Amino acid sequence: MPDFSEKGWLADIALRYELKRGKTCLTEKRHLGPLMVQRPFYPEQGVAHTYLLHPPGGVVGGDTLSININVQPYAHALLTTPGATKFYRSAGGTASQTQTLTVAQEGFLEWLPQENIFFPDAQVCLTTHIHLASSAKFIGWEMQCFGRPVLNEWFETGKVKGRLNFYVDERLILTESMRVEGLQKQAAAMREFPMFGSLYIYPATDALKEIIQHHLEKVNPLVEYGLTDVDGILVLRVLGTQTEPMMACFAQVWQIVRQHWLGYCPEPPRIWAT
């Protein structure tokens, strides 16, 4: 794979969702550079499904991406991506992606991107800020794949740094950091799994945690997992060797949460099957 110069894309997108006559509408869309979205569609009544697109197909050293999602009171938006986000090798520059997700009172955001894939020699900095009103609902995940294990290509060199801050009513509830510098140095921490993921659910309840735990024990997914309640946020952490079992695990939990909160089980976005 060729090297890329340190001069990269500058991409910024800001989306605002509001409830209008019983339907969530994308009322504001601003974008700079190659980040963009398709028009929302409505496979479920009133819920705005949106695909977030990055046309060049991948991210290289020097690229700077900023994603801002704002869900207003009582609005309900679901965002996903049509495929994995690929972070390619760097010739020296760092690829940076910052995500800010904000949900107002009684709003509901489902942030369900497909996995990030970090190629060997990638230099990446990821930052996620989640700001929720206490009466909001949120389910979202991040899946990280280091190298391309299906091709026996491992992330032996490179650096990925990440930070997630989770606020409720502007109070910092949860902060997490990630630092991976080649899997040779990280093998003990990740137990030699090339993939890990985190799924966040707010608000947490004992009943919901019990339902999810029972499901995970029953289906015995092909992943290693742990489920914890962190000050009212349910966090499901997963280690795996392939994308499909991890995605299946998260998608099933997402359906369980939807059933518990809204009384019906949604169909997965069709784009996940392509």
Curated annotation (Swiss-Prot):
Q: Which GO terms describe its cellular component?
A: cytoplasm
| Family the UniProt entry places it in | Belongs to the UreD family.
Where can this protein be found? Answer: Cytoplasm
Q: Which Pfam families match?
A: UreD
Output one GO MF annotation.
Answer: nickel cation binding
User: What protein is this chain from?
Assistant: Urease accessory protein UreD
| Listed InterPro entries | UreD
Query: Sorted alphabetically, which keywords does the UniProt record give?
Result: Chaperone, Cytoplasm, Nickel insertion
| Induction (free text) | By urea.
**Where does it primarily localize?**
cytoplasm
Q: What does this protein do?
A: Required for maturation of urease via the functional incorporation of the urease nickel metallocenter.
Q: Does the keyword Chaperone apply?
A: yes
Please describe the quaternary structure of this protein. UreD, UreF and UreG form a complex that acts as a GTP-hydrolysis-dependent molecular chaperone, activating the urease apoprotein by helping to assemble the nickel containing metallocenter of UreC. The UreE protein probably delivers the nickel.
